Amino acid sequence: MTPTLNVSDRVLVLKDDISNVNYGIGEIVVFYHPDTYVDVSQASKLVDSLKIWNYFDAPSQMVYIKRIIGLPGDVIKIDTLGNIYRNNELLTFKGILNETFTNQEKYSVPNDSYFLLGDNRSNSQDSRVFGYVPVDNLIGKAFYVVYPYENIQILDND
């Protein structure tokens, strides 16, 4: 997520289970990999809402952080210049540089999923690689960097 986030940054997350989060374009979200089974039972949600993630979690419990580019039902197009179009409208984000790509891609987001990209587009494992992220795999919105202290800031979600 460079330049928005650094590898060592720790963020606060407004969790979906607690506050019934509505997600929008440009927001930075924390989620489980699309191949991860997510138990949506109330007991599991309660335990998960209290969890603090770390680097030592099993791979199946690792979480990722990316930016929402496509909502359920959207059509996303990335051209060879790195421009991103959502339903034929150009998306732009502050501080994110477009990077050139060798081929043009088009993605139709399923009605129960999101399309997510990292801010470091040329070096990111994101929806271009692992596919669409089901809504049940979203944990919440990242909204504040809390560590390291010199990087404390509100995250710009647009």
Descriptions of predicted regions:
Residues 1-158:
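Extended hydrophobic leader/signal-anchor segments used for secretion and membrane insertion
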